[in-house]
Amino acid sequence: MILLALTSNRGSRDFQYFSDKQQTRLFEEVINTAQTWAENPLEQLMFVVGATQGEMFIDVRRVAPKSFLLVPGVGAQGGSLESVAKYGMIEGECGLLVNSSRGIIYASSGEDFAEAAEREAAKLRDQMSELLEKAK
């Protein structure tokens, strides 16, 4: 099951950062509650956390330290792959599934679309590989 936790859109702060009397923010409550639904949360749950959230990955990892995170928003939406890796990776593992759609599919609108998309995908792949190597 993949659940929205903390999205990249500007309006997300209107709701996802809302906190209750115990100062638990909505995105934290979503993660905490969802983990009670699954027999094996680490194998059955993944949480969507937008790449534009940067240091907020620290708070997400506090409530979901080993969970896989689906991370959209790298590239065209302005999310930093370096910040995602720095604050979101699990020590000794990765724990991230990074998605960059617009940065790749809109690399060119010309006849060189396929080549431009391939270049952008390869560039992102190489950046990810470099960050994974550093994390070892």
Residue ranges and their predicted role:
Residues 1-45:
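Conserved anion-binding
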Residues 23, 27, 53, 77, ...:
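Generic structural signal for well-ordered, non-membrane alpha-helical segments
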Residues 35-39, 60-64, 125, 129:
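Surface-exposed amphipathic alpha-helices with a cationic face
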Residues 47, 51-97, 103:
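A C-terminal functional module that forms or caps the active site or interfaces directly
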Residues 27, 31, 57, 81, ...:
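Generic structural signal for well-ordered alpha-helices
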Residues 9-12, 77-78, 104-106:
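Short, small-residue-enriched loops and turns at beta-alpha junctions
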Residues 83-93, 106-136:
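C-terminal helical cap(s) of enzyme catalytic domains, especially alpha/beta-barrels
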